[in-house]
Amino acid sequence: MLDPNLLRNELDAVAEKLARRGYKLDVDTLRQQEERRKVLQVETESLQAERNSRSKSIGAAKARGEDIEPLRREVNELGEKLDAAKAELDRLQQEIRDLALSIPNLPDDSVPVGRDENDNQEICRWGEPRSYNFDVRDHVTLGEMAEGLDFAAAVKLTGARFVVMKGQIARMHRALAQFMLDLHTEQHGYLETYVPYLVNHDTLYGTGQLPKFGADLFHTRPLEEEADSSIYALIPTAEVPVTNLVRGEILEESALPLKMTAHTPCFRSEAGSYGRDTRGLIRMHQFDKVELVQIVRPEDSMAALEELTAHAEKVLQLLNLPYRKVLLCTGDMGFGSSKTYDLEVWVPAQNTYREISSCSNMWDFQARRMQARYRSKDDKKPRLVHTLNGSGLAVGRTLVAVMENYQQADGRIQVPEALRPYMNGLEYIG
């Protein structure tokens, strides 16, 4: 959520920045709401003061032996007017909050202006895609040859966009997650966390999935019943529970940066993606991911974004997977992001790069929703932290990349050296 002071005092500048990402801010409505809020605020304060004054007069009149009934009626009438004004002010403030919750984050000035992924800016490439002297197979074919990917069984059990993994393919999937966690905890300084896969709606509001993206989630009960605290949603990413660990907290400055990682399944309805990536593991309703989260001081967040992205890149480098780093344009960034890098891994069967990690600096956008703050020795009042997150990496898509980039002419899959300690020294699958 944006700073309310920006919406009150710098509305035109905010609207211009939001326009860069293709969002049209309803400036007129916001101005009208703010003017009405000021009027109601003054009215309620005036009625409260007058009611207090007249209430005190009752005691004085009673001491003088005067008839206090007229004063009581007046106080009651003032109370009714005050209650009505407060109710209207509460309704208006809720309208303002609802509108504020629907407004995306402001893009950083370093983000290129553009409409969609075609306007993203490639920063660099790492590694050279391998040349093959045989017809390249995709991961679905390779997985079936290894008797390790069974999509038909998943359809029987659940439906489309699910998979059953077996044997050495399932083992490699597990090995990848273990390898990523060990790298991030032992070399990059992250604290491993285990978190719930079901979260409440306060948690989803905190990181920005609600109220705007409820249709993308799997809920235990209909979303319309959200007033019931027993309604949960399956997490779309570990970013949601891990970041919310600091919700409502005031951290000591000495505790920052706080770096956490978690390996979880992720659940997404993929609303709006009908017909896209229907074959294989690229776009699933359930997939595993190792998430990286950093909670930092505001002045450190841009450097932290570079560091976090480098940590995700290190996984690809150690697996020797060619990739490219892309800076997303304003029109392609996520709702809560101020700046995002995507890492795209080379997928031979598609002859292109596909997203495998998205690393974002959220500024204080999530922190304001969560009221996540820290106490600085230089400030009397606690300040909002900045939050960052990124995939380190998406495990299923990493499996796709390993299977296709390490495939052999006979259909076997070579196990990357970095993974062999996690697979009892196994060199080939199939």
Swiss-Prot record:
InterPro entries: aa-tRNA-synt_IIb, aa-tRNA-synth_II, aa-tRNA-synth_II/BPL/LPL, Ser-tRNA-ligase_type_1, Ser-tRNA-synth_1_N, SerRS_1_N_sf, SerRS_core, tRNA-bd_arm. Keywords: Aminoacyl-tRNA synthetase, ATP-binding, Cytoplasm, Ligase, Nucleotide-binding, Protein biosynthesis. Pathway: Aminoacyl-tRNA biosynthesis; selenocysteinyl-tRNA(Sec) biosynthesis; L-seryl-tRNA(Sec) from L-serine and tRNA(Sec): step 1/1. GO terms for molecular function: ATP binding; serine-tRNA ligase activity. ATP binds at R268, S269, E270, E355, I356, S357, S358. GO terms for cellular component: cytoplasm. It is found in: Cytoplasm. GO terms for biological process: selenocysteine biosynthetic process; seryl-tRNA aminoacylation. Residues 44-65 are annotated as: Disordered. Its main location: cytoplasm. It is an enzyme of class 6 (ligase). Its EC number is 6.1.1.11. L-serine binds at T237, A238, E239, E291, S391. It catalyses: tRNA(Ser) + L-serine + ATP = L-seryl-tRNA(Ser) + AMP + diphosphate + H(+); tRNA(Sec) + L-serine + ATP = L-seryl-tRNA(Sec) + AMP + diphosphate + H(+). Homodimer. The tRNA molecule binds across the dimer. Belongs to the class-II aminoacyl-tRNA synthetase family. Type-1 seryl-tRNA synthetase subfamily. Catalyzes the attachment of serine to tRNA(Ser). Is also able to aminoacylate tRNA(Sec) with serine, to form the misacylated tRNA L-seryl-tRNA(Sec), which will be further converted into selenocysteinyl-tRNA(Sec). Consists of two distinct domains, a catalytic core and a N-terminal extension that is involved in tRNA binding. This is Serine--tRNA ligase. It comes from Edwardsiella ictaluri (strain 93-146). The gene is serS.
